[in-house]
């Protein structure tokens, strides 16, 4: 049957969806999660279910300000931005070490950031989400992850295009190349690290890192039930740890390195200058903002304080998966794997001659 309300225009409206309707228990337990109600038909069914529950269920409207009080939302958003810009892990630091002294960091950084956001938001979100609403409807889109949604929707879009098979094949082939090159770029810091810490050649370094990567990939593939291992590693490493390390990096740049010295290096060879206003932003506002998000996240997800309601709520599932009565073995093994890798690389660093020379203020090589 035709569904005229499922169209691209409504999909664009769905992107700006500041108000949500949740159905939840009147007296929820710690493990109970509210269910989001999307669409007019679903809302009518939810109202009937609430009326028949005898007061056990209720509908609650969540406005934009209440959602903005959720520190997990800010942590996830910041983690995504840092990951897409390679900030918060060693990639950007390693590749920066290969630059020449007078290379233009300002213009190239501005170009890369602008192009990245245009592709992610403009070409990604503004194409995928409206198309998903047109094909699946609002209820079919709600709660789905962006990457998985794209793989489901874009083939449908290409199937409706002239020469869609050609354009679809070309798109996913280029996506494959982008994924391969991105993976290689993220392996380079580890390769360089093993080379310096062990004093081995590139072949030996690639072999060691390849074995570690193969083991980690096999571990995730083995624990595929509910994607628990992948989800655990993605959150604690791909979101939480990147956020923490990015916060540390900006504090080091603004305070340890020094904002004046940093801007002097930043403008060396630059075609344009960074406005003065970014000095207090980098030194004061960004660290304060990121630390505030981190503290609020700890209070909400670790200690269970709900800022929107001003009362105690549920602890994060990522925490209860690791500790407590409802701990999850794949999640615990995932974190044990991460800790083991940290210890391994920590031991490599401790015995590294290059690290010892750096501690003494000496150059890396004689």
Language-model region placement:
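Membrane-water interface at loop-to-transmembrane-helix junctions
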Residues: 74, 78, 197-203, 236, ...
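Extramembrane terminal tails and long inter-domain/linker segments of multi-pass membrane proteins
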Residues: 25-26, 30-33, 45-54, 265, ...
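Transmembrane helix-loop junctions in multi-pass membrane proteins
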Residues: 1-9, 70-73, 100-104, 127-139, ...
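Membrane-embedded translocation segments of transport machinery
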Residues: 1-180, 184, 197-198, 204-208, ...
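Generic alpha-helical transmembrane segments
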Residues: 179-183, 241-255
């Amino acid at each position: 049957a035709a569904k005229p309300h499922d169209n691209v225009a409504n999909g664009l409206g769905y992107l700006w969806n500041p108000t949500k309707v949740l159905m939840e228990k009147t007296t929820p337990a710690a493990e109970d999660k509210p269910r989001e109600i999307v669409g007019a038909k679903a809302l009518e069914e939810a109202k009937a279910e609430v009326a028949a529950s005898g007061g056990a269920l209720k509908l609650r409207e969540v406005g934009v300000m209440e959602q903005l009080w959720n520190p997990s939302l800010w942590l996830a958003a910041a983690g995504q931005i840092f990951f897409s810009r390679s900030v918060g892990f060693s990639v950007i630091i390693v590749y920066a070490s290969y630059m020449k002294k007078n290379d233009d960091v300002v213009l190239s950084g501005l170009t890369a950031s602008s192009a990245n956001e245009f592709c992610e938001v403009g070409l990604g979100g503004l194409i995928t989400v409206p198309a998903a609403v047109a094909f699946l409807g609002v209820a079919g889109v709600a709660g789905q992850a962006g990457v998985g949604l794209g793989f489901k929707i874009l083939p449908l879009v290409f199937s409706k295009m002239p020469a869609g098979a050609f354009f679809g094949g070309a798109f996913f082939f280029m996506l494959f190349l982008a994924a391969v090159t991105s993976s290689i770029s993220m392996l380079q810091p580890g390769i360089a690290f093993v080379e310096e810490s062990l004093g081995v050649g590139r072949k030996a370094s690639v072999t060691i890192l390849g074995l570690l990567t193969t083991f980690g990939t096999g571990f995730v593939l083995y624990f595929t039930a509910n994607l628990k291992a992948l989800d655990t590693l993605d959150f604690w490493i791909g979101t939480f740890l990147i956020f923490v390390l990015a916060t540390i990096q900006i504090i080091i740049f603004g305070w340890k390195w020094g904002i004046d010295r940093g801007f002097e290096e930043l403008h060396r060879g630059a075609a344009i200058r960074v406005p003065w206003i970014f000095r207090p932003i980098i030194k004061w506002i960004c660290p304060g903002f990121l630390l505030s998000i981190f503290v609020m996240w700890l209070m909400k997800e670790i200690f269970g304080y709900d800022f929107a309601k001003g009362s105690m709520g549920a602890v994060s599932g990522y925490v209860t998966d690791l500790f407590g009565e409802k701990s999850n073995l794949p999640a615990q093994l995932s974190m044990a794997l991460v800790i083991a890798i940290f210890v391994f690389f920590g031991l490599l660093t401790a015995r590294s001659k290059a690290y010892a020379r750096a501690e003494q203020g000496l150059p890396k090589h004689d």
